[in-house]
Structure formats: structure tokens, C-alpha cells
């Protein structure tokens, strides 16, 4: 009994592992929708800020820069709702109503939360908020959402809302309410239920999320401490995991918290903290006591609180036009009771409330968002006056806590460990007077230990720009000379894609499934080293999407050109170092293990060779009548997918064969394509989609019969093995000529209005890729067979939306509605279908006067789908018959003639 239970449990795990991976892959596809707009938003931010910050006082130029910048600002400020809408649409079969409902859900949820978030002190003399039983919740836990003070759930909240909305949509989109409130039935009910569910979700988040926010801050702090004390180990670990998750498509879900939330660091915690700086090369700490006068370079603006002795922070008042000596004199006499906060310094440097604006737009939390926030804040490159009389320029290094003590002391911004730090007795002499103030460095710690702007993204640049192209060159040169051109066309374009756009999958997938040890043991390790060295050597190169050359110029070279110390020069240095490892390693291992990378390995099967093999199969068919051609081809497909034991799930739609396998390394895509697939795609590493046109469902059924034991697999394999052998083929006997009906009339299967195929919103039908015919806009849901007598249901799709009929040897396809395959896509065999009530079975014969082949709930179908119905004579029949339309427009009744098919060999 115990053994049986273990087997059942293991079988359950294996069955659900594939579906979980598909779900995660779908989640990542959803995350990519908002992430895809970030590059352009980042360009708007970068270019807009560059124009605005260098406007030289020209109002029109500054306004234009701000105009461009705000286009990017709005995207980053609203990332959570973008994630919510994207996830909702992804998991609801691209339903626009689901996206709308997600927005309603998000807005109402945040409105409910805002009413229960109470400031600790309404007069703002104390910071923080009280939320239910949480007291003095820090500002970093709160964000401005749609103009409301709400919990800063960031992209996590967006994903939660999107997932719940998708669930509610899929559950209620077809709901029928009593007639008295029938207006709210169907999809109109979805936003209503979302608004209702937003209440308990808001309360649950208020009960839990403040603790989550605190935990995220602790994670960020822990990673920062690991980075500061562990020589960049946080980036090393991150780099490997991020690359290792690429095959599973879940890397977006992994890096999103570190890029976009306080887990990647937060500047909000130092808003009201004193500004202490340890300048490069100094062995002491100083206070910031002012900033350079905008109107008079070389002169300083001193906060009135520091100059006049008012207790507390400066509260906006300033004394302008001070030289450093007089500024220090004022400060020395009053310094002990006053300090300048980071919020005040940022606002003073930018002459506006820029700190609050950055917080409102969510640009003070997360490694990448902080980089963007600093980039557009207006404080980088600005000078401040220190309490030792020297000036200091604010750069990325002010906040970058990255490097070990043997070449730098990490971030320049510090905070006292506890209490008031003691001043060094002998102050530095300025202008002959000991009127400066310095402090003991041992009493300070890094202000934001968890922060190094862009530390979780910049590591991509060296290996994407230089490392991968070097590996690609090695793989090209490892191919035989006669096939290097072939290898270059595939590998070269993939490597160039990595360089220009930072999209690496085309290159990585050329060897990932062929040699996973090369991916995980070499490539992912070198990617981790790239992240580690960029962090360790104190780089701060930003990005919005990936490590592309475009991002390198915009967020590395340009900031360095402005003196902001992004240290982008490290990218080519580290990249060349990695290339010296990538090239010989990939070259040697490709040859040593004879990896069948593009241009290497076994001889590629040509189309000519495939046709010859197919002819041999037809020859064998004459000597073994136990198997038809479809079964033989299905057997070959089954082998191409690694055998029946490698099939985890098998399905098909109107044109695509969908196969989930257990081990993707066993799949031979070349054979699948040579068997007629127009293309083979992967949406997850184990999920293959092969485009076979209308043969997809036929192959699916035949393969399923083999897997279920309905076909003798042992005998079929003998036939397949014989086709692969070199024995002499028997003589091909002439194919007997069958009697063919000269003219065949196809009848309308339903009442409705005729439309040309050009009006069908599906390129497959509009462009007549599978055949020719007409479209019918049905007026009722009673569909009948398209002939008077002996109409065979050649194929009935399990989703109930499409059928292929055999009318006297002519294949005719009926496809009810557009994209309607989605309605019952998740139904298991035997489950009752929605919308479609199928009355016929595959292989059955029916007549026009018998009961309908399918009854359709047309009202329910129209709620979400276009009911226009393509009625197509398949291309395989058009090869032998000429189609002559009888009716092409206007109303049509069921049973009325639509086409006449004339046999092409008919003698006139």
C-alpha cells in the first residue's frame, strides 16, 4: 500500500510540474508586457532630463525637456497598475474587460486603504503612519497612488490584483443574473465583483503588508550589508540566479522586487536624516552646511537655521551669496544645535520640492528605480560646501555602498552609529583660521547600506555586449570551414541581437538544450562574475530593460560625460576580460564534446531527402495495410518528440499541434519541420507548438491513439524502422484510379448573412491559407451538415468550435466564430462544453434533415467573441476541384447551395 501511495504521489507531482511551469511561463509573458515599455520610458526620462538639466536658463528648452521627461515619469510612477492590467489580460485570454476590471480593482482597493492610513501627527512634526494595529509605520511603506496615500505594494500589489482579476473574470464572465438585474450579467458583472472583492483584499493588505514592507527593507539591508562586507557577494549570487532562471522564463519575477521595491534599497529612510559626507581620500567625516549658489558660482547658499542658530532643520529659509570663510564662521558658532536633512538638501539643490516628487513617482525604492530617480533628480553634478571648508560634488558614488576598504571606503553618505559624534580636536585650518569642523570616522556607518544604484542590472553589460559575441565567434570558428557561413547566419545574428538590444535568448537557446551544462556551468557562472566585478569595482551604469548598447550609451557613457561617475569605462574592461574566457572555453568545449551547434554535428536533413523518405513510406504502405499514412506520420512525430513516454500533454487547435514534453532534449525539431510543420515554437522550455495547418488535429488524434494503445506501436515501429533501413525497396505498384464525382454541391450549414473572407478578422482565413470559401454571420445557433446525404464528420474538434466534413470526397471546414477555441481550451475529455453542444461524433455520417451537428449558444458567444463563421473548402480538395460560387452575398438559409465544385480532370 505504501508503494502504491508513493507511486500515486510521484505521478501527481510529475503531472503537475509541467502545468506549473507553463503557468509560470505565462506569468513571465504577462510581466514582459509592462517591462517592454520601460526602454522607451527610460529614453524619455534620460533625454528629457538631459535637456532640462542643461537648458542654461532657457525657459523654452527647459520646458521641452520636462515635457519629454514626464512621458517616462508616468510609466514608472504607475508600474503597479500596469502590471495589474497586464497580468489580468494575460490570464483571461487577452480579454479587454479583464484589463478594465483590474484598473477598477486597483483604484477602489487603494481608495479603501487610504481611508485607514492615519498620519502619526497631523501637524507633521513626527513622521510615520498608524495603520490598524501597526504603529509608526515608516514613510517608505506608503506611496501616492492615483493621488491617494496608500500602501506601497509596488509591483507585488499589481500582480496580486491582476491575478485575482483574472480569476474573477474567468469565473464570472458568462454569469447569468435574474432578469430584473439582467443588465449586469456577463462581462459587466466582472468589474462589479472586483470592486466588492477589493474591500477584503484592502483590509487583508492593511493587516499584513506593513510587515511585508518592513521585511523587504530588511532584505534590502541584508543584501547591502552582504555587498559591503562580502565583497559584492550579493551581486554574484544575484547574477547566477538571474541567468539560471532564463530557461524557465521566471527571471522577471525574480528581479522585479530588487529593481522596483525597497528590497533593492531605499532612499526614503534618510529623508529627515542629517547629511554627513566622507569625501574621497579623507580620513574624517564632515557635515554639509550649504550648496553652491545657482546665480553666483563660487558662492554658497547657507540654511538660515545653520547661520542664525534656530533649532532644528532649516525649514526653507536661506542666506545666499556667502563665501566659504564667512559661511564656516556662521556655522561654527551655531552648529551644535542644527542640521541639514537630505530632503532639504535635495529640495535646495533643485529649487523645488523634488524629494517629495521622486517619492510620489516611486523613484526612491529599488536599485533600478533609484538610479533613474537620481538621474532625473537634478542633484547629480551639483556642489555642496562641507564643514571642513572644501566643496564636494554629488555623484552616484555618494550613495553607492559597494566596494571593499582596500581601494575605497564605499558610499560617501554616512550616518552616526549612535548619539552625537565627537569632533576631531584639531580642526583643519582654512584661510589661516581653524574655523572648520571634522568628525571621527569610526563613529559613522553607511547611510543606506543596502543601496548601490543599478547593482542588480549593470552586470549584464559586459557579457551581453562583449562576452556573448566572443562566445558566438568561438562557436562559428568551431564549425568546419565549409559550414561557417551557415553557422554565422544563425549564431552571428543572435550575437548581434544580444549586443544591440540585450536580448540573449536567441543565442543562449542555440546550446541551452543541447548542452545545459555549458549554460549552467560556464555561461551562467561568467554572467555572475560580470555582475560581481561591476559591483566590486564600483560601477553604476543604469538600464531600463537589458544590457544593450543603446542603454550603455544613454545610461553609462552620457552620465559619465556629465561627471556623474557611473564608471562606464569598466564595461569594456570587464567585457574583454570575460571574452578572454568565453572564447577559448566555448571553442574548446564545442570541439571537445562535438556539440551539434549550428554548422556542426550530423548532416542536416534536406527537403529533397525528406520527400524521398516519404516516398519510401508510401511504398511500404502497399506492403503493410495495417497502418495508413497518417498513422505512419504520427508515429514519426511521436519519435521526434522523444517517444510516447516523453509526452506529458498533447493538444491541438485549428492549425497548431501543442505538445508538452518531459525532457526537451529528446525533441528533434528538424524532423518535426521536415514532416511539414511551418514552424516550431516554444512558449516554455517543455511546451512545443508546431504549425501544421488543419493537419494538426489529425496528427493529435493519431498520436493519441498510439499513446493510448489503440494502435499496435510495436508493429508500427517495425514499419518505421524499415523505412529508415537501407534495404532495397519493393516495386511501387500503380495507384488505382478511383471514380470521382464530377460535380459536388456544398450547402449552407446555417441561416445567416454571407460575407467575403476578406472581412474575417483572422489572417489564416482572410488570406486563404487553408483554402477558399465564404464567411457566414449566423442568425441562429442551429448548425447542420453541408450536404444532402452521406456527409461524414471527418474531424470534430474537442473544443466544439470547428469541424471538418467529407462531402463526397471534398473536405470542408466549418469554423464557428473567431478565437473560439479558447472557450473550452481548458476542458478535460468528458467535461461539458460551454457555448457549444456537439451532436455529432468523429467518423459519423449525417444528413441535412437529421438533428444538428452542433447547437451554439449564440448569445453567450457574442458576449466575448466575433461570431463570423468561415466556411472553407480545404486546399487539399481545391488541388483536384475548381470552386464555383453560387451565392456570395445577402441572406442565406440552411440547406441552400453555396458552392459548386467541378472536378478538374472532367472532359469538356
UniProtKB/Swiss-Prot annotation:
The principal localisation class reads membrane
- Judged by the first EC level, this protein's enzyme class is transferase
Is Transport set as a keyword in this record?
yes
Against InterPro entries, the record matches this protein to: Dup_hybrid_motif, Glu_permease_IIB, PTrfase_EIIB_Cys, PTS_EIIA_1_perm, PTS_EIIC, PTS_EIIC_1, PTS_Glucose_EIICBA, PTS_IIB_1
Active site residues according to the UniProt entry: 653 (phosphocysteine intermediate), 815 (tele-phosphohistidine intermediate)
Provide the E.C. number(s) assigned to this enzyme: 2.7.1.199
Q: Where is the PTS EIIC type-1 domain?
A: 1-264, 451-602
Q: Which reaction does it catalyse?
A: N(pros)-phospho-L-histidyl-[protein] + D-glucose(out) = D-glucose 6-phosphate(in) + L-histidyl-[protein]
- Transmembrane residues, as ranges? 31-51, 71-91, 100-120, 155-175, 189-209, 459-479, 487-507, 509-529, 536-556, 571-591
**GO terms for biological process, alphabetical:** phosphoenolpyruvate-dependent sugar phosphotransferase system
Topological type in the membrane: Multi-pass membrane protein
> Looking at the record, which segments are called Unknown?
265-450
GO MF term set = kinase activity; protein-N(PI)-phosphohistidine-sugar phosphotransferase activity; protein-phosphocysteine-sugar phosphotransferase activity
Which SUPFAM superfamilies does its entry note? Duplicated hybrid motif, Glucose permease domain IIB
Q: Which stretches make up the PTS EIIA type-1 domain?
A: 762-875
GO CC field = plasma membrane
State the Gene3D superfamilies in the record.
Glucose Permease (Domain IIA) (2.70.70.10), Glucose permease domain IIB (3.30.1360.60)
Instruction: Give the matching CDD domains.
Output: PTS_IIB_glc (cd00212)
Domain PTS EIIB type-1 intervals? 631-713
What are the record keywords, sorted?
Cell membrane, Kinase, Membrane, Phosphotransferase system, Sugar transport, Transferase, Transmembrane, Transmembrane helix, Transport
Subcellular localization is given as: Cell membrane
Q: What information about domains appears in the record's comments?
A: The EIIC domain forms the PTS system translocation channel and contains the specific substrate-binding site.
Q: What does this protein do?
A: The phosphoenolpyruvate-dependent sugar phosphotransferase system (sugar PTS), a major carbohydrate active transport system, catalyzes the phosphorylation of incoming sugar substrates concomitantly with their translocation across the cell membrane. This system is involved in glucose transport.
Under NCBIfam families, the record lists: EIIB_glc (TIGR00826), PTBA (TIGR00830)
Q: What is this protein called?
A: PTS system glucose-specific EIICBA component
Organism encoding this protein = Mycoplasma genitalium (strain ATCC 33530 / DSM 19775 / NCTC 10195 / G37)
Amino acid at each position: 500500500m505504501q508503494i502504491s501511495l508513493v507511486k500515486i504521489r510521484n505521478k501527481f507531482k510529475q503531472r503537475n510540474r509541467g502545468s506549473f511551469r507553463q503557468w509560470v511561463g505565462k506569468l513571465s509573458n504577462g510581466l514582459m508586457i509592462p517591462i517592454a515599455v520601460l526602454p522607451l520610458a527610460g529614453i524619455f526620462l534620460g533625454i528629457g532630463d538631459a535637456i532640462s538639466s542643461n537648458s542654461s536658463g532657457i525657459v523654452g528648452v527647459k520646458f521641452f525637456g520636462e515635457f519629454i521627461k514626464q512621458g517616462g515619469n508616468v510609466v514608472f510612477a504607475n508600474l503597479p497598475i500596469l502590471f495589474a492590467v497586464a497580468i489580468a489580460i494575460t490570464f483571461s485570454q487577452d480579454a479587454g474587460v479583464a484589463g478594465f476590471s483590474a484598473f477598477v480593482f486597483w483604484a477602489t482597493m487603494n481608495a479603501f486603504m487610504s481611508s485607514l492610513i492615519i498620519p502619526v501627527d497631523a501637524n507633521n512634526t513626527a513622521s510615520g503612519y498608524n495603520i490598524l494595529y501597526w504603529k509608526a509605520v515608516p514613510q517608505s511603506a506608503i506611496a501616492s497612488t492615483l493621488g491617494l496615500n496608500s500602501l506601497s505594494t509596488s509591483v507585488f500589489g499589481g500582480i496580486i490584483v491582476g491575478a485575482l482579476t483574472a480569476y474573477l473574470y474567468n469565473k464570472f464572465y458568462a454569469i447569468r443574473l435574474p432578469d430584473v438585474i439582467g443588465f449586469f450579467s456577463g462581462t459587466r458583472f466582472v468589474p462589479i465583483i472586483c470592486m466588492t472583492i477589493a474591500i477584503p483584499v484592502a483590509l487583508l493588505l492593511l493587516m499584513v503588508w506593513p510587515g511585508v514592507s518592513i521585511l523587504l527593507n530588511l532584505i534590502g539591508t541584508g543584501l547591502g550589508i552582504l555587498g559591503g562586507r562580502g565583497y559584492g557577494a550579493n551581486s554574484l549570487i544575484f547574477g547566477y540566479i538571474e541567468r539560471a532562471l532564463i530557461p524557465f522564463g521566471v527571471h522577471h519575477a525574480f528581479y522585479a522586487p530588487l529593481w522596483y521595491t525597497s528590497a533593492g534599497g531605499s532612499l526614503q529612510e534618510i529623508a529627515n536624516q542629517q547629511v554627513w559626507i566622507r569625501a574621497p581620500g579623507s580620513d574624517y567625516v564632515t557635515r554639509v552646511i550649504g550648496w553652491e549658489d545657482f546665480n553666483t558660482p563660487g558662492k554658497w547658499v547657507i540654511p538660515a537655521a545653520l547661520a542664525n542658530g534656530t533649532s532644528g532643520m532649516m525649514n526653507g529659509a536661506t542666506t545666499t551669496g556667502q563665501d566659504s570663510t564667512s559661511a564656516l564662521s556662521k556655522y561654527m558658532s551655531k552648529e551644535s544645535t542644527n542640521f541639514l536633512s537630505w530632503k532639504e538638501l535635495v529640495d535646495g539643490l533643485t529649487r523645488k520640492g523634488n524629494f517629495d516628487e521622486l517619492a510620489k513617482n516611486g523613484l526612491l525604492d529599488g536599485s533600478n528605480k533609484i538610479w533613474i530617480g537620481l538621474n532625473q533628480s537634478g542633484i547629480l553634478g551639483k556642489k555642496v560646501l562641507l564643514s571642513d571648508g572644501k566643496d564636494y560634488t554629488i555623484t552616484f558614488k555618494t550613495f553607492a555602498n559597494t566596494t571593499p576598504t582596500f581601494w575605497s571606503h564605499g558610499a560617501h553618505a554616512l550616518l552616526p552609529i549612535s548619539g552625537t559624534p565627537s569632533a576631531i580636536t584639531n580642526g583643519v585650518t582654512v584661510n589661516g583660521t581653524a574655523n572648520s569642523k571634522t568628525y571621527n570616522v569610526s563613529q559613522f556607518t553607511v547611510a543606506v547600506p543596502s543601496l548601490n544604484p543599478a547593482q542588480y542590472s549593470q552586470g549584464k553589460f559586459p557579457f551581453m555586449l562583449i562576452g556573448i559575441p566572443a562566445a558566438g565567434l568561438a562557436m562559428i570558428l568551431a564549425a568546419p570551414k565549409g559550414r561557417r557561413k551557415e553557422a554565422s547566419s544563425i549564431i552571428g545574428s543572435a550575437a548581434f541581437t544580444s549586443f544591440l538590444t540585450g536580448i540573449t535568448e536567441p543565442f543562449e537557446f542555440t546550446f541551452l538544450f543541447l548542452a545545459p551544462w555549458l549554460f549552467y556551468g560556464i555561461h551562467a557562472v561568467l554572467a555572475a562574475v560580470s555582475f560581481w566585478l561591476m559591483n566590486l569595482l564600483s560601477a553604476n551604469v543604469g538600464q531600463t530593460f537589458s544590457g544593450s548598447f543603446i542603454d550603455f550609451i544613454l545610461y553609462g557613457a552620457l552620465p559619465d560625460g556629465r561627471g556623474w561617475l557611473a564608471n562606464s569605462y569598466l564595461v569594456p574592461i570587464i567585457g574583454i576580460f570575460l571574452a578572454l574566457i568565453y572564447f577559448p572555453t566555448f571553442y574548446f568545449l564545442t570541439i571537445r564534446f562535438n556539440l551539434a551547434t549550428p554548422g556542426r554535428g550530423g548532416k542536416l536533413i534536406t527537403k529533397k531527402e525528406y520527400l524521398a523518405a516519404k516516398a519510401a513510406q508510401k511504398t511500404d504502405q502497399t506492403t503493410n495495410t495495417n497502418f495508413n499514412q497518417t498513422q505512419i506520420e504520427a508515429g514519426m512525430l511521436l519519435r521526434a518528440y522523444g517517444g510516447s513516454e516523453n509526452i506529458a500533454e498533447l493538444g491541438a487547435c485549428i492549425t497548431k499541434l501543442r505538445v508538452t514534453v518531459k525532457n526537451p532534449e529528446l525533441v528533434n525539431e528538424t524532423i518535426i519541420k521536415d514532416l511539414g510543420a511551418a514552424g516550431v515554437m516554444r512558449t516554455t522550455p517543455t511546451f512545443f507548438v508546431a504549425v501544421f495547418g488543419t493537419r494538426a488535429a489529425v496528427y493529435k488524434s493519431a498520436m493519441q491513439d498510439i499513446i493510448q494503445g489503440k494502435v499496435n506501436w510495436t508493429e508500427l515501429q517495425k514499419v518505421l524502422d524499415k523505412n529508415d533501413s537501407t534495404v532495397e525497396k519493393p516495386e511501387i505498384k500503380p495507384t488505382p484510379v478511383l471514380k470521382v464525382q464530377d460535380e459536388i454541391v456544398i450547402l449552407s450549414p446555417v441561416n445567416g448573412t454571407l460575407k467575403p473572407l476578406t472581412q474575417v478578422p483572422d489572417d489564416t482565413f482572410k488570406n486563404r491559407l487553408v483554402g477558399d470559401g465564404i464567411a457566414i454571420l449566423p442568425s441562429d445557433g442551429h448548425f447542420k451538415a453541408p450536404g444532402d446525404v452521406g456527409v461524414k464528420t471527418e474531424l470534430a474538434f474537442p473544443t466544439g468550435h470547428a469541424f471538418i466534413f467529407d462531402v463526397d470526397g471534398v473536405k470542408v471546414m466549418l469554423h464557428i466564430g473567431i478565437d473560439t477555441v479558447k472557450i473550452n481550451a481548458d476542458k478535460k475529455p468528458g467535461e461539458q462544453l460551454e457555448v457549444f453542444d456537439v451532436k455529432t461524433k468523429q467518423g459519423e455520417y449525417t444528413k441535412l434533415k437529421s438533428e444538428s451537428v452542433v447547437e451554439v449558444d449564440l448569445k453567450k458567444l457574442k458576449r466575448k467573441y466575433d461570431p463570423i463563421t468561415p466556411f472553407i473548402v480545404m486546399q487539399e480538395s481545391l488541388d483536384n476541384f475548381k470552386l464555383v460560387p453560387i451565392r456570395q452575398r445577402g441572406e442565406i438559409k440552411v440547406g441552400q447551395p453555396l458552392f459548386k465544385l467541378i472536378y478538374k480532370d472532367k472532359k469538356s
